[in-house]
């Protein structure tokens, strides 16, 4: 989807030789594949593709305009990204900012723990590219469906609610501090905000705040420039909902 390539998952396909070399149509909008379509189906699909292209052209005419509802309420329309390559589409489509930068993909795309400098360059590029627009970066959310070999995590019966995201960061503080140092440094170059995932207690928030203060003190002592990014939590667990009440 990110690359604008139609794709299907889990769709049964005829895999015998009878389909070899035949024309196929992949309809990613409703999860259908047509093998050797007749003229009527082919014409209908071509018409739909033309209509989709016209819709995209129409949306591009809205670039630079504010998002306002009929009753005058302004809406902030942000984009989600997984890596720095996605920034081109964000800029092309005139997003108001980045609502979620999934920083775990920086880890998943490498065979080693990303260094502070490696992360700093990526976050800095995102901040500078967005040119004053808000960039909300989620701290490492590894675990569950996002496994990383070099993390050497133990197998769990229920990894979705196990040691993942902020729990890993708090049990492996050096990894967390490295990321926070990179984030605070990059925040001096743009409007970066930091979001902490899978929070379930006030105690975790207090632990995070203590580590953040350590990081800021360390940067100041070393004479390294850093900003003052917004910070918040991702409300995604029942405990977080009840706690926020």
Residue ranges, per PLM feature:
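Acidic, glycine-rich flexible loop/linker segments
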Residues: 1-92
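Conserved alpha/beta-domain cores
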Residues: 56-245
